[in-house]
């Protein structure tokens, strides 16, 4: 195909027309509008639950609900005199009568209102004091506190955050708690078990395994601390001597090792039973409330562990976080308290 060249006059004329058209277009364009702000995606609706504070009776395997509310109540403790439960809701601590007609109004414990309590709390063995975990505007993280039984004389026992109380020694001399070491030098954050004298003093670290350890609770004879850990690759119940696991945690002993994820072991006051919360295999944390959660029980281990332990299922329910985080046995070891949850229609976040 033969090509021809355009004349110089035609080219100049075409360039001029394009230039004039560009100027006219520019004159007709107004100022640039700022981009519209991107709308925030709507927040997910917040879960809501009905709480049923329940009592399980070992004698006949009956379950009685003593209080129900369409809000979250957590972690009931039985008072040493057997008359009431301590439970938390909305950052406050409450007493609920055990022997009332049912659904008696909770009575608030008058603790410093600037503190926001969580679900780790318990009365002392003599009933004169309450240990609890709470955050303050200054701390912005959970610390361990001690107060008189009526809520007065509040003072911080463990300033480091986050730290969570879990159990009294049976003689009332020590508080067992967990503290999260911050991540450092490539080592991830990690929870370990500590104790501190109830009269005040220096905390003592009781284990050193890099696993996540939680929920320490004393045996009634004061010789052992039972807790849950993922150090075996799944969540199981373990125990260590009350004065520590020794170098390399050489004295730590694994108590459970089946297909369930076990949390928050609680020895009965008569030393006959060990109660704990169990999630289905693969549930990574205790932070959720889930269907199919179980409360299981086994005979209290002796000096030597029986393998495998004889574990029985007491109840299967909708529960988890808040159901039984701290010891909730009755003083006579015949009953224990726990919280059953029922999902409610979700409310949109404000």
Where are these regions (language model features)?
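Bacterial N-terminal signal peptides
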Residues: 13-23
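Sequence signature of WD/YWTD-type beta-propeller architectures
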Residues: 27-350
């Amino acid at each position: 195909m033969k090509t021809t060249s355009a004349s110089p006059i035609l080219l100049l004329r075409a360039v001029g027309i394009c230039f004039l058209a560009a100027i006219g277009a520019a004159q007709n364009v107004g100022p640039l509008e700022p981009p519209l702000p991107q709308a925030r995606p709507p927040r997910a609706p917040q879960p809501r639950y009905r709480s049923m504070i329940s009592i399980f009776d070992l004698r006949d395997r009956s379950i009685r609900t003593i209080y129900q509310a369409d809000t979250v109540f957590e972690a009931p403790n039985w008072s040493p005199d057997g008359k009431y439960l301590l439970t938390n809701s909305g950052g406050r601590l409450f007493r609920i009568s055990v022997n009332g007609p049912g659904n008696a109004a909770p009575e608030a414990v008058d603790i410093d209102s600037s503190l926001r309590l969580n679900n780790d709390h318990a009365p002392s063995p003599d009933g004169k004091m309450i240990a609890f975990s709470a955050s303050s505007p200054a701390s912005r993280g959970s610390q361990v506190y001690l107060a008189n039984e009526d809520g007065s004389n509040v003072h911080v026992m463990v300033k480091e955050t986050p730290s969570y109380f879990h159990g009294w020694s049976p003689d009332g001399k020590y508080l067992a708690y967990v503290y999260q070491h911050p991540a450092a030098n490539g080592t991830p954050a990690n929870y370990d078990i500590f104790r501190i004298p109830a009269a005040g003093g220096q905390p003592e670290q009781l284990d050193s395994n890099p696993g996540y350890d939680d929920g320490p609770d004393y045996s009634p004879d004061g010789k052992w601390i039972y807790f849950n850990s993922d150090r075996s690759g799944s969540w199981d119940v373990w125990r260590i001597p009350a004065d520590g696991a020794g170098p390399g945690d050489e004295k730590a002993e694994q108590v459970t090792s089946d297909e369930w994820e076990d949390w928050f072991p609680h020895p009965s006051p008569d030393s006959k039973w060990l109660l704990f919360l169990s999630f289905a295999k693969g549930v990574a944390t205790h932070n959720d409330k889930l269907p199919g959660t179980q409360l299981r029980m086994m005979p209290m281990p002796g000096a030597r562990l029986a393998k495998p332990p004889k574990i029985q299922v007491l109840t299967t329910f909708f529960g988890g976080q808040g159901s039984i985080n701290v010891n909730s046995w009755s003083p006579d070891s015949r009953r224990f308290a726990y919280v059953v949850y029922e999902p409610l229609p979700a409310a949109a976040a404000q």
